[in-house]
UniProtKB/Swiss-Prot annotation:
The modification Phosphothreonine is found at T266, T276, T287. It comes from Rattus norvegicus (Rat). Signal peptide: none annotated. Residues 724-750 have a biased composition (Basic and acidic residues). Forms homo- or heterooligomeric complexes. The central region of MAPK8IP3 interacts with the C-terminal of MAPK8IP2 but not MAPK8IP1. Binds specific components of the JNK signaling pathway namely MAPK8/JNK1, MAPK9/JNK2 and MAPK10/JNK3 to the N-terminal region, MAP2K4/MKK4 and MAP2K7/MKK7 to the central region and MAP3K11 to the C-terminal region. Binds the TPR motif-containing C-terminal of kinesin light chain, KLC1. Pre-assembled MAPK8IP1 scaffolding complexes are then transported as a cargo of kinesin, to the required subcellular location. The keyword Phosphoprotein applies. This is C-Jun-amino-terminal kinase-interacting protein 3. Residues 459-515 are annotated as: Interaction with NTRK2. Residues 424-459 are annotated as: Leucine zipper-like domain (LZ). GO terms for cellular component: axolemma; axon; axon cytoplasm; cell body; cytoplasm; cytoplasmic vesicle; dendrite; Golgi membrane. Residues 50-80 are annotated as: Kinesin-binding domain (KBD). Residues 305-315 have a biased composition (Basic residues).
């Protein structure tokens, strides 16, 4: 701890050791320590050191702690600034990532939909393949069952074949034994036979029966060559009747297989098949199977010739087979001699002939064939015929000879009977097996067919369900299309409401559409939150103005404690507050400054202990608020008066003597001398204090000569006069979007000089909107005023007269049809949907009027009725119809250039004009009694001209209202008459004119483009709608840049070519999408852009769209008027204009700033920012550095034109006007004029300059000067040097200060301020 050292003389040395070793104390703590030291010194001098002995250590500790806290606070502030910058960068990165995520989500939704569609298709294919697989499995199962049955049948047939083969072998052996016995009998009885030949012939026949005992048991089939029992006639007949009664038919292969299994075969019968009985006739006739089998019904129609042919062919086959078997038998006998004896017997007996004969039965009903037993070689048919036709003696002969072989006949007959029974049983079994197998095969076939039919039925049902769903969808679509067509044909008032539409007919949304709706809803929510934030921020600023006590937290508790302790009697006077110098930085576009200012102001406002009163109810609160305002303005006045280092002239705060070296030498720039002089400041309307100003525009009379106006054809434009290249202010151009006089050559219009200073000002009350016309040379005199409509008029623009340099009416079609690949046939131009009229613009009006479906706008008459479909509808003043149509083929009267190709899909917008009001038909002279006696009538109107001859080909004024109405009035005569009017889709926010095209910006993000007709008058019945994007946002501002139009759309700027209606370029004016472009001002090669709720102005190149410069006006305003007073810490730009070689800036708190435009800008580091292209700079060697020199157009040989000038500006040369408004500056308007008769330049000179040698030069320079009048409008008026209260007392005259004032004082009414500025045109 430091102690106090006392010397003999009573001197005190305080902190002597700490000054050498301690750290540097802050300025505030050192001031406090010095004050405390002097106070302690006085106490010690008056009393004794004992008084401060115990107090001194405590004070030292407090001061040390205060110093440490201040240092920590400064460190925390630095860290806070760094964190805020990081936070802003993170916010920007977050917005970027958020946008990327939205894009990714959209793509994901699209991919998901595509995958679902593909998955559905694959699922359908899988189901189809499964169905086919089930069918194939069923077929394979049926085939496997058939194969197994066929294998079983094959095994059974093999077994039967083996049994038959064994039986055949036994029969051959028996036959051989019979042959041997017969030979032995023949050898033994040879002598007897030779003795009597007739007797032998008679006894041979019974012998033949005894020798062949099996003849009646086994017979051979004539056709197939297989053994068939002879007594099977009953079986064949019954089987035939069974098959004919059941009408059953089996396939050929199954019949052949059953025939093989039902008959016994010999080894010699290879490749043959047994016959199946197919006829119900009771006979033993069979049909060979080597021929093609016929159905059951076909056998009755077979002719006898076919049967004879088959019998002959079969007989030859049987002969061959019999000879073969006989040869085999002869081989088995072993002796040719023995066989020769047998052959002699067979040859001598005609009944044993081998060849069969076909003969008829006795009844003659059916033919019978002889059955030849090939194994025995006996013709049984001839024997049977002989026995059947012979008498009883033959039978007796047989009986007599039967005892020759008695010992063998019993055994043969028994064997024959057994074989016959066995064969019958086998035949029955085989027949039953055949029927069973046939039935099983048929059942299998039918079951397979049933499964296939079931599958086909299921597929048909699925297809039926799909088709039914498709039919339902098509029916719903048809109903929806019909309802849309009916709705489109009806009037808007007859549209069907959504609750009347059935649920089945309502539209069903897909996932993509639902996602789009959700995204739009989120965007609307963001915009709503943004608007709420802006409203809350505005209310806070207004509350900060009305309640300064909320922000006044100046002294801490320690200060209050010490002030009560040491200065209880009286408070010391406040010390003069020193303001640090403000450095102006030109930085890249960022929103960090705005965020810091907003957070700082919110912290200040939220520091109040009581809630803010936005809506006071009683008069006491109003008077208290007025007193608080006066106190605030008084503080601003003190700050302005105490601000040293700047000059004050003509109501402007000028910078100190600032000399800027021009590029060609070291002479001083004379622009600083041309200070605007305020010439007028009064309320616009004295009688109505509630009138509010909205917008204004000067009358542009370029290209119009009143002495050449014709009542039928309109005024003829001046040849060679271009509205975009002529002198705007010399001819009355007021708009900030039009060029200033310094960038164009002067063109004189003597007829229009007297009236080019007229200004139309739009005012509004609670119920109506009015137009107040004044002359800027005499701003105190109202030329005329009239009511426009009941809604607020948001914008106004002066449109010049028709000119030869205007675009022809048909150019917008010709340019769009020249390059089809550029414009596209689908009506989309550069990502923007193009909508236009369906009729060609070059068709004369007489041709257009012949169409019954297109209303015709009669521009010259006041009594116009709306026509629709040939019927007059007087109750409907204006209608709007929109229909998507294809541009029709041009008729014979149209030019050939329009028949290149079909036009794009366009939107034909046609309207009927609103009937003119009855009051508008009165001449302007009749309304002279409504105004003062000093009202000046227009001098350009001829005395003999009637109100009916006013044409829109002359200069006009276009007014856009909030309810979507667009009004066109004449700018030269009969102002009250509305020439044209049209109802657009949304509010009209901005109007510009480019070479015969008027672009109207709407609040729904679309541009309406109007053009003139063939007679030079404006055609509002046909126009084009240009959509700038989705989702829709308002187009807040537009500016004409050469022959292009810059549109402020959200945070972007779209450069539009009005001739081709295409977007040539789009760029971001601000990195954050929530920000909006609000004002645009163009001159030369530069365009100044302002952003909503931002204090930074941005300069862009007019051709390359390069970002050139940033200027922040907030530090300048805070330095001039004091930080934190009246909410001036938050500065937003509300008005912007380039006029008189100056950039005029109006802020939201009523401050007017004028910044001279310079060719070069020297930054705070000495860096040169810009150069004139046709001049040489002494610092051109440094131009290679980045940001050193901006490339511009032009060369040494070319003349000085506007395209070689970039409007840089420096806040070091900025000038602040002490005349301002209480609320936001609504508008700036510049018109030519000269209120002051002579302008004495010595008034504007600085005190240090002498008038001696420079006076002749100033006089010579004054002859080249041009004069312009700049008007500003806003609510209220204030002089920052005087403050609030004193001016009211002066204006009210001799009156008591305490008397009750009206609710709205004179200083709070809407004011206009007029400055006259002199400048040297380029």
């Amino acid at each position: 701890m430091m102690e106090i050292q006392m010397d003999e003389g009573g001197g005190v040395v305080v902190y002597q050791d700490d000054y050498c070793s301690g750290s540097v104390m802050s300025e505030r703590v050192s001031g406090l320590a010095g004050s405390i030291y002097r106070e302690f010194e006085r106490l010690i001098h008056c009393y004794d050191e004992e008084v401060v002995k115990e107090l001194m250590p405590l004070v030292v500790n407090v001061l040390e702690n205060l110093d440490s806290v201040l240092s920590e606070n400064q460190e925390h502030e630095v860290e806070l600034e760094l964190l805020r910058e990081d936070n802003e960068q993170l916010l920007t990165q977050y917005e970027r990532e958020k946008a990327l995520r939205k894009q990714a989500e959209e793509k994901f939704i699209e991919f998901e939909d595509a995958l679902e569609q593909e998955k559905k298709e694959l699922q359908i294919q899988v189901e189809h393949y499964e169905f086919q697989t089930r069918q194939l499995e069923l077929k394979a199962k049926n085939y496997a069952d058939q194969i197994s049955r066929l294998e079983e049948r094959e095994s059974e047939m093999k077994k039967e074949y083996n049994a038959l083969h064994q039986r055949h072998t036994e029969m051959i052996q028996t036959y051989v034994e019979h042959i041997e016995r017969s030979k032995m009998q023949q050898v033994g009885g040879g002598g007897q036979t030779e003795s009597s030949l007739p007797g032998r012939s008679r006894k041979e026949r019974p012998t033949s029966l005894n020798v062949f005992p099996l003849a009646d048991g086994m017979v051979r089939a004539q056709m197939g060559g297989k053994l068939v029992p002879a007594g099977d006639h009953w079986h064949l007949s019954d089987l035939g009747q069974l098959q004919s009664s059941s009408s059953y038919q089996c396939p050929n292969d199954e019949m052949s297989e059953s025939g093989q299994s039902s008959a016994a075969a010999t080894p010699s019968t290879t490749g043959t098949k047994s016959n199946t009985p197919t006829s119900s006739v009771p006979s033993a006739a069979v049909t060979p199977l080597n021929e093609s089998l016929q159905p059951l019904g076909d056998y009755g129609s077979v002719t006898k010739n076919n049967k004879r042919a088959r019998e002959k062919r079969n007989s030859r086959n049987m002969e061959v087979q019999v000879t073969q078997e006989m040869r085999n038998v002869s081989i088995g006998m072993g002796s040719s001699d023995e066989w020769s004896d047998v052959q002699d017997i067979i040859d001598s007996t005609p009944e044993l002939d081998v060849c069969p004969e076909t003969r008829l039965d006795r009844t003659g009903s059916s033919p019978t064939q002889g059955i030849v037993n090939k194994a025995f070689g006996i013709n049984t048919d001839s024997l049977y015929h002989e026995l059947s036709t012979a008498g009883s003696e033959v039978i007796g002969d047989v009986d007599e000879g039967a005892d020759l072989l008695g010992e063998f006949s019993g055994m043969g007959k028994e064997v024959g009977n057994l074989l016959l029974e066995n064969s019958q049983l086998l035949e029955t079994k085989n027949a039953l097996n055949v029927v069973k197998n046939d039935l099983i095969a048929k059942v299998d076939q039918l079951s397979g067919e049933q499964e296939v039919l079931k599958g086909e039925l299921e597929a048909a049902k699925q297809a039926k369900v799909k088709l039914e769903n498709r039919i339902k969808e098509l029916e719903e679509e048809l109903k929806r299309v019909k309802s849309e067509a009916v709705t489109a044909r009806r009037e808007p008032r007859e549209e069907v409401e959504d609750d009347k539409i059935p649920m089945a007919q309502r539209r069903r949304f897909t996932r993509v559409e639902m996602a789009r709706v959700l995204m739009e809803r989120n965007q609307y929510k963001e915009r709503l939150m943004e608007l709420q934030e802006a409203v809350r921020w505005t209310e806070m600023i207004r509350a900060s103005r009305e309640h300064p006590s909320v922000q006044e937290k100046k002294k801490s508790t320690i200060w209050q404690f010490f002030s009560r302790l040491f200065s209880s009697s009286s408070s010391p006077p406040p010390a003069k507050r020193s303001y640090p110098s403000v450095n102006i930085h030109y930085k890249s576009p960022t929103t960090a400054g705005f965020s810091q200012r907003r957070n700082h102001a919110l912290c200040q406002i939220s520091a109040g202990s009581r809630p803010l009163e936005f809506f006071p109810d009683d008069d006491c609160t109003s008077s208290a608020r007025r007193e608080q305002k006066r106190e605030q303005y008084r503080q601003v006045r003190e700050h302005v008066r105490n601000d040293d280092g700047r000059l004050q002239a003509c109501g402007w705060s000028l910078p100190a003597k600032y000399k800027q070296l021009s590029p060609n030498g070291g002479q001083e720039d004379t622009r600083m001398k041309n200070v605007p002089v305020p010439v007028y400041c009064r309320p616009l309307v004295e009688k109505d204090p509630s009138t509010k100003l909205w917008c204004a525009a000067g009358v542009n009379l370029s290209g119009w000569k009143p002495n050449e106006e014709d009542s039928s054809n309109g005024p003829k434009p001046a040849p060679g006069r271009d509205p975009l290249t002529c002198d705007r202010e010399g001819e009355g151009e007021p708009k900030s979007t039009h060029p200033s006089p310094e960038k164009k050559k002067a063109k004189e219009v003597p007829e229009a000089d007297a009236t080019s200073s007229r200004v139309w000002i739009l005012t509004s009350t609670l119920t109506t909107s009015k137009v107040v016309i004044i002359d800027a040379n005499q701003p105190g005199t109202v030329v005329d005023q009239f009511t426009v409509c009941n809604a607020h008029v948001l914008c106004i623009s002066s449109i010049p007269a028709a000119s030869d340099s205007d675009y022809p009416p048909g150019d917008m079609f010709l340019d769009s049809d020249v390059n089809p690949e550029d414009s596209g046939a689908d009506g989309v131009l550069a990502g923007i949907t193009l909508v236009g009229c369906a009729t060609r613009c070059n068709v004369p009006r007489s041709n257009c009027s012949s169409r019954g479906d297109t209303p015709v706008l009669d521009k010259g008459q006041g009594d116009v009725a709306a026509t629709a479909n040939g019927k007059v509808n007087p109750s409907q003043s204006t209608e709007e119809a929109t229909e998507a149509t294809e541009v029709p083929d041009p008729g014979p009267s149209e030019s050939e250039a329009t028949t290149v190709r079909p036009g794009p899909l366009t939107e034909h917008v046609f309207t009927d004009p609103a009937p003119t009001q009855s009051s508008s038909t009165q001449p302007a002279s009749e309304n002279g009694s409504e105004s003062d006696g000093s009202i000046v009538q227009p001098q350009v109107e001829p005395s003999g001209e009637s109100s009916a001859t006013t044409s829109s080909a002359a200069p006009t004024m276009w007014l856009g209202a909030q309810n979507g109405w667009l009004y066109v009035h004449s700018a030269v005569a009969n102002w009250k008459k509305c020439l044209h009017s049209i109802k657009l889709k949304d509010s009209v926010l901005s109007l510009v004119h480019v070479k015969g095209r008027v672009l109207v910006a709407l609040a729904d993000g679309t541009l309406a483009i109007f053009h003139r007709g063939e007679d030079g008058q404006w055609d509002l019945s046909n126009y084009h709608l240009m959509d700038l994007g989705h989702p829709h946002h308002s187009i807040r501002c537009m500016a004409v840049v050469d022959d292009r139009v810059w549109c402020g759309y959200k945070n972007k700027v779209h450069v539009i070519q009005p001739k081709t209606m295409q977007i040539e370029k789009s760029f971001d004016a601000h990195p954050r999408r929530e920000s909006q472009v609000r004002q645009l001002a163009w001159i030369g090669d530069g365009v100044w852009v302002s952003i909503r709720l931002d204090s930074t102005l941005r300069l862009y190149h007019a051709h390359t769209h390069q970002h050139l410069q940033d200027v922040d006006i907030e530090p300048y305003v805070s330095k001039m008027l004091g930080t934190g007073k009246l909410g001036f810490s938050f500065v937003r730009i509300t008005a912007l204009l380039i006029a008189g070689n100056r950039l005029w800036v109006g802020t939201g708190n009523g401050v007017v700033i004028s910044i001279p435009l310079t060719e070069t800008v020297v930054l705070h580091r000495g860096q040169l920012l810009g150069l004139r292209a046709n001049k040489t700079s002494p610092t051109s060697g440094e131009g290679t550095r980045p940001g050193g020199i901006i490339h511009v157009y032009g060369d040494d040989s070319s003349d000085k034109t506007a395209s070689s000038f970039i409007p840089y500006c420096s806040m070091a040369q900025a000038q602040l006007c002490f005349h301002g408004h209480r609320d936001a500056v609504k508008f700036f308007v510049s018109v030519p004029g000269n209120v002051l008769a002579t302008l004495n330049g010595s008034v504007l000179d600085s005190p240090s300059e002498g008038p001696g040698p420079a006076a002749p030069a100033a006089d010579a320079e004054g002859q080249k000067l041009k004069n312009a009048l700049v008007l500003s409008g806003g609510e209220g008026y204030i002089d920052f040097r005087i403050g609030d209260g004193e001016d009211d007392e002066t204006e009210e005259g001799t009156g008591d200060v305490n008397q009750t004032k009206p609710s709205l004082s004179k200083a709070e009414r809407s004011h206009i301020i007029v400055w006259q500025v002199s400048y040297t045109p380029e």
